[in-house]
Amino acid sequence: MPAPATTTSVDEQTLSVIDHLTKSYDNKSEIDSTLIDDYITVLGSIDLLGAIADFIPIINHILTDNLYHQIDPNRLLIELLQKIVSRLSFGQIVSVYSPEFIVSSLASSDNVPITKLCLSIIIQKLHEPETVSFIAENCISFILLKNYLSDAKLDLGIVNQIELYVNSLILNDVTNLLEEILTDTKFVILYNSIRNSENTILLARLLDFILILLTYKVDLPLDPRLYTFSNVEIVTFKDDPLFLILLVQFYVKLVQFSVLEEVSPVIGNFVNLYKDPTTDDFVKVEVIDILVKLSYATNSLLIEYGLELALNSELFKSHNLIKVYEYNEPDIKLLSNVNPDLIVHSSNVIYEDVLSNLSLLNNKQYFPILLNFIGSTDVFPRLEQDYFTTKLKHLPADKLYVILLEFSKFSHSRKFLLSNATLTNDYLLDNDNLTFVNNELWHTKLQVLENLVNATDSDSPELAHWKPYLQDSFNLMRHGKKIRDVVPQVSILDETL
């Protein structure tokens, strides 16, 4: 290979690196990783302008060589090249890499490092008008999305970079390119072809792509049929449980965007899937996340729909919760995570019919159900009567503080806690009497105190009375005694769940 035609204005360290790379390329020998890594570290302070004509070509030669992985096993040259081009304008870059080279490299993934480099250039320089014009003139968005949505074997790194490209269009507010992606006929035809595909890898990418676009515009001008699925289709996907889980997770995220009108029938189909005894438990567990999102939604329409769904499906009726007595994971998760107010509103005898028959306090698997229903003003009096009035003081410290943490989150349970002087004094105010055996327990107590001192229950004389003392205890834990200052001891009251 000819010697580099560098000028005298190039610093010695840069000349040394170029010379080393040239010899490594000629001899097909591994580059000195330490030399390159050290150079990358100081690159920001070096004037590269005089070396660009030599630097980039030799790196390109190595990257496109059949023995690239042998010459650069640690992929440092990709990092080096990205650092170099990041310091150039897009106009300077196209003087080194021809527009035709960039377009052809983006269209083909035969040389993954080069494709990634060109994608990186486009993304990094997206804020420059010249880059946006280049993308529009050369249909770059369509080239990238066609590969993304058509090639199931596309390198995962390239997949991630294309998603980053679309995200970058949104972050840089490149409206003309985004609107083209949403409305141009060739894009719409591409989306429809993938929606009708049986390839679940490509379908999953289409759904990921739609989620990205929703961060740009919630009322997407896309056909809702692109992301709605019939009951027949969902049943068909049972043969591919991994995709089915991805589909459910898509709808969990979709609920966050309050896209209800088009997708509510699909969510209903998922509830039917949940009730189907032949559905795998790990799929059911994912479906529950949709119900959880609906039950805690701030949008009134979503809340109403969630309640309607619970009522019509009878999910919380005792005949649909039979397996909870067999420690069925989906049923336990359902009762432990869905908003307890929604559960009670859809089945006002849930305590009598189901919860009262479970050992909520002493059984580790049912304990999360107890914690969840502390938040229900309807169920809490029953829990108070059956468990909290007499049994709390007999609990191991770790379990007790988890319960106290839940108490601290709601006004009705705070009232109960602060009405109990023994609990408040012994477990919240006395920092010496109780032994803390682990960091987690210490921080749980700190969180309880923080919740209480930040509470604003205007109609609670109990809170008004205890707040100064709670504040002192909180300050002592936060700014005074640390867990490392506590002498470890052994207590029979301290057990793990």
UniProtKB/Swiss-Prot annotation:
It is found in: Cytoplasm. Its main location: cytoplasm. Keywords: Chaperone, Cytoplasm, DNA damage, DNA repair. InterPro entries: HSM3_C (IPR040752), HSM3_N (IPR041335). GO terms for biological process: DNA repair. The keyword Metal-binding does not apply. One of its GO terms (cellular component) is cytoplasm. Pfam families: HSM3_C, HSM3_N. Involved in DNA mismatch repair in slow-growing cells. Acts as a chaperone during the assembly of the 26S proteasome, specifically of the base subcomplex of the 19S regulatory complex (RC). Belongs to the proteasome subunit S5B/HSM3 family. This is DNA mismatch repair protein HSM3. The lineage of its organism: Eukaryota, Fungi, Dikarya, Ascomycota, Saccharomycotina.
